[in-house]
Curated annotation (Swiss-Prot):
GO terms for cellular component: endoplasmic reticulum membrane. This is Triple QxxK/R motif-containing protein. It is a single-pass membrane protein. PANTHER family: TRIPLE QXXK/R MOTIF-CONTAINING PROTEIN, TRIPLE QXXK_R MOTIF-CONTAINING PROTEIN. It is found in: Endoplasmic reticulum membrane. The gene is triqk. Belongs to the TRIQK family.
Length: 84
């Protein structure tokens, strides 16, 4: 008798989940497939944040490379010009 009484009472959350399951079951295959593909595409998409971070990292490396060679390959020395 305890099992029969326990199975009839459900929490509101369980009732809600069962209702959603019924609604989801009623959808046809193309709608379910489109929803799944949309969710996968959203998960796999590269965000603008990552693109900006990679671009900034590349620019910083190029600037450091340029500054290194600019400072090492200049013909005049700053200290010699100020002493004369």
């Amino acid at each position: 008798m305890g099992k029969k009484d326990a199975s009839t009472t459900r929490t509101p959350v369980d009732q809600y989940r069962k209702q959603i399951g019924r609604q989801d079951y009623k959808k046809n295959k193309p709608v379910l497939k489109a929803t799944r593909l949309k969710a996968e595409a959203k998960k796999a998409a590269i965000g603008i944040k990552e693109v900006i971070l990679v671009t900034i990292a590349i620019l910083v490396l190029l600037f450091a490379f340029y500054a290194f060679f600019f400072l090492n390959l200049t013909k005049t020395d700053i200290y010699e010009d100020s002493n004369n």
